[in-house]
């Protein structure tokens, strides 16, 4: 991306997935597209060409009034009281899983973390899956992985043996699974995310349809384990490479005098918060965002015709020396109050 920036600047053309795209680099170009003041860009068409067949209906793939309607319902699922309950349930499950780890020279943290976050997502967010066999749960987990991996498929047709085909099959598996358990979640309200989505409503009394619940469960469970895995594994890497920060974070954690911190106590881990922000800067879990122009428009005074796909690249901005001194250096203090 640096070479592209040096040669072409903020806005340039390239080809991806058999389509012509515009790359929007730097904070000004990114801001113009994301603020979308003239409503020239849409999320749905941009993301759909990459992940639409597997995650359609997720909030990230919705636009305008429909996005607003569903977001107003969705925000009721993430109130502070609900998040506090989720933390209380996650703590013992995480502790139990970590006790089973056997680190060694060949231990692959990313693989173990991905299994952990996926297990937590399926076991806790779905509130268990009564009546299913272990093989059925394994097939659901595999379906999630297949859907995520399908987004990077080179062959984007239903060809047997390809990632794309496995992703399409995975989406169908997930839809069938959630549809099977949805009536039970509708009939009885519990604290798991699946049940919450079945019962929450907006301030005006609007609720999700059955199809919307299924779409959101598939998207949220993907997001819950994929981005979390990337972030935590990055933090493990940099803490391992920077023992002074590892010691600082460990001391803060031990000072809480509990292995199951509450939602409020997590706010006291200031050092870990700085480390997380710096890791999100260095290795963005979502390095690019997709949009599509629905009318002729401009990005930083460059003409962009209707129908153009746009790749917004925050990851590049995260590494620009104009804004981040020594951008490749791990420096969590850059997010501290005295440095802002």
Regions found by a protein language model. Give the residues of each.
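N-terminal membrane-proximal hinge/A-helix region immediately C-terminal to the signal-anchor transmembrane segment
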Residues: 1-69, 88-96, 170, 295, ...
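Conserved cytochrome P450 K-helix/beta-meander segment immediately N-terminal to the heme-binding cysteine loop
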Residues: 195, 312-340
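Conserved, non-catalytic sequence blocks in retroelement Pol enzymes and Pol-derived host proteins
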Residues: 80-83, 185, 263-270
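Cytochrome P450 heme-thiolate monooxygenase catalytic core
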Residues: 42-48, 66, 82-231
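Conserved cytochrome P450 K-helix E-x-x-R motif and the immediately C-terminal K′/meander segment
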Residues: 1-9, 176, 180, 259-300, ...
């Amino acid at each position: 991306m640096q070479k592209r920036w040096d040669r072409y600047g903020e806005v340039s053309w390239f080809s991806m997935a058999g389509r012509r795209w515009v790359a929007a680099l730097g904070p000004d170009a990114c801001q113009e597209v994301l603020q979308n003041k003239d409503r020239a860009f849409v999320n749905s068409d941009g993301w759909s060409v990459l992940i639409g067949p597997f995650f359609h209906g997720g909030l990230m793939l919705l636009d305008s009034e429909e996005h607003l309607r569903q977001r107003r319902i969705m925000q009721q699922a993430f109130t502070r009281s609900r998040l506090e309950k989720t933390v209380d349930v996650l703590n013992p499950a995480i502790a139990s899983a970590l006790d089973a780890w056997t680190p060694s020279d060949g231990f692959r943290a990313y693989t173990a973390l991905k299994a952990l976050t996926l297990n937590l997502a399926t076991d806790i967010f779905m509130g268990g899956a009564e009546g299913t066999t272990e093989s059925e749960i394994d097939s659901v987990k595999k379906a999630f992985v297949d859907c995520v991996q399908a987004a990077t498929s080179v062959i984007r047709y239903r060809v047997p043996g390809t990632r794309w085909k496995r992703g399409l099959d995975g989406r169908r598996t997930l839809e069938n699974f959630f549809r099977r358990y949805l009536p039970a979640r509708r009939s009885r309200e519990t604290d798991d995310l699946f049940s919450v989505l079945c019962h929450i409503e907006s301030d005006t009394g609007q609720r999700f349809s059955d199809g919307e619940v299924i779409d959101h469960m598939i998207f949220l469970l993907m997001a819950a384990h994929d981005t979390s895995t990337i972030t935590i594994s990055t933090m493990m890497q940099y803490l391992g490479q920077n023992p002074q920060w590892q010691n600082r974070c460990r001391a803060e954690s031990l000072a809480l005098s509990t292995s199951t911190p509450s939602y409020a106590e997590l706010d006291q881990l200031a050092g870990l918060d700085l480390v997380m922000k710096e890791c999100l800067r260095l290795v963005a879990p979502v390095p690019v965002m997709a949009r599509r122009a629905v009318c002729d428009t401009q990005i930083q005074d460059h003409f962009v015709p209707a129908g153009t796909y746009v790749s917004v690249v925050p990851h590049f901005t995260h590494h620009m020396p104009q804004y981040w001194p020594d951008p490749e250096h791990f420096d969590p203090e850059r997010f501290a109050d005295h440095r802002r």
